[in-house]
């Protein structure tokens, strides 16, 4: 089915939005990716660039938790802790409680989500872009 969607997309020059946790599908089907955590975009850019050089800790964790059929076997990563409750408004860095390498700025929860340029057409949350 995905191949048929891709054919129609290419034939008609359509843009499509895929929402998925399936990293393999995203890698195959998209040119640009937006990674979201707790309802906010934490990294966005060309799929190849984001996969090759992730700049946000959550993106890195997603990639490290994905099995590969190529190369040597590796232990898949999982994140400690629980995702934040989305019932109440989140202020500051929503990922810091689960981040393996949070900065002091992230931990103090006084930051707001702000995407900064980290590469050509590649942007990541300012708070966590130094945590990878």
Q: Residue ranges of each PLM-predicted region?
A:
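Charged, flexible cofactor/metal-binding loops and thiol motifs
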Residues: 47-132
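P-loop NTP-binding/switch modules centered on Walker-like glycine-rich loops
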Residues: 1-74
């Amino acid at each position: 089915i995905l191949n048929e969607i891709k054919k129609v997309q290419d034939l008609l020059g359509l843009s499509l939005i895929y929402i998925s946790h399936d990293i393999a599908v995203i890698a195959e089907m998209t040119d640009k990716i937006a990674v979201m955590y707790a309802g906010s975009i934490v990294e966005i850019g060309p799929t190849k660039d984001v996969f090759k050089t992730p700049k946000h800790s959550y993106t890195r964790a997603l990639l490290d938790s994905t099995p590969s059929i190529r190369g040597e076997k590796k232990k898949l990563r999982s994140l400690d802790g629980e995702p934040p409750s989305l019932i109440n408004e989140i202020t500051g860095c929503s990922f810091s409680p689960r981040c393996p390498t949070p900065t002091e700025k992230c931990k103090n929860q006084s930051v707001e989500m702000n995407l900064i340029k980290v590469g050509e057409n590649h942007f990541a949350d300012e708070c966590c872009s130094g945590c990878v």
